Amino acid sequence: MTREIQEITSKVELILLSVLKGFFYLGPIREHSLRRYIDEGQFKGEIGVKGENSAFLYHQESDAPIEYMAFDPIKEVFVEKSAPPREAIGNWLSELGILGFTSEKNEELYRFSLNANEFSEEKVNISDVGFGVSQVVPIVIQGLLMRGGETLILEQPEIHLHPKMQMKLADFILSLALHGKKVIIETHSEHIINRFVRRIVEDKSGSLNSLIGINFIKNSADGSICETVNLSETNGIVNWPEEFFDQAAEEQQKIMNAIINKKMENKK
C-alpha cells in the first residue's frame, strides 16, 4: 500500500510540475538591488519570487536574437523586433526611463549599472539609484525572457514607480500579451488601468480588447465578489463598479469646487 501511495504521489507531483512549469511569479516587493551579485553556483534558472536572481538570469542568456514587441514612441504603435536578449531588455528599460542599463561580469561577480540621469551618461551602480528601478528591472527581464504561452504573475507591479513609469509599464505588459505571453497582475494603480483603456480605445485593429480582461474584487457580507469590468473600443470602461478608481476624480472635483467657492467669497 505504501508503495502504491508513493507511486501515486510521484505521478501527481509530475503532473503539477508540468502544469506549473510555464508559470513565473514576482511578489509585491522585489528585492532591493545589490551593489554586486555573487554566483555561488546555486542558480537554477529561476528569477525568484523577489527577483533576487535577476543578474544570473540576465547573464545566462545567449546572444541569439529573440523576437519581441517594442513600442514606437513617435507613432505610438507596437512594432515587432528582433534583438539579442540583453539589447531587448535595455531597449524596454530605456522606454521606461532607465537609460544606459548594462552589466559587467568578473568571474563569479555581477554588477548592474545605468546612466546617472537623463542628462548624463556617467554610469552609477544600480544600488545607488531610486528604489523603483529595482522593482521594475526583474519584471522586464523575466517578461522578455519567457516564451510565448508562458504566464507571468505580478503583484502590485506599480510599487515605488511614479505615474509616468506606471503607464509605460502598462505598455510593456501589453507588449507581452501581443507576443503571445500571458500576464496576470494584481494592481491598485489607476494609471496602469487607464493606460490599458487608452490603448484599447486608440487601437484601430480591434485586437487589443480581446487580449485584456479586468476584474474588480470587492467585499460584501457574503465574502469577496469578483466583478468583470467591461471594456468598449468606443466608450472605454462601460460598467464602472462602485468605488472603482473614483477617488481621484472625486478629489479633483472637490478641489475645483473649493477653488470656485473661494473665488466667489473673495469677490464679496
PLM regions and their residue ranges:
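Phosphate-coordinating catalytic segments in nucleotide- and nucleic-acid-processing enzymes
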Residues: M1-V136, R147, N230-K268
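Extended, amphipathic alpha-helical scaffolds
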Residues: V129, P138-I141, K168
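Hydrophobic core positions within the conserved protein kinase catalytic domain
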Residues: V140-G143, I173
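A short, proline-enriched helix->beta-strand linker immediately N-terminal to the Walker B motif
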Residues: G143-E150
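Walker B catalytic motif
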Residues: L154-P157
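ABC ATPase nucleotide-binding domain "signature" loop
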Residues: I159-L161
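C-terminal lobe/lid and adjacent interdomain/linker elements of RecA-like ASCE P-loop ATPase modules
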Residues: K168-K268
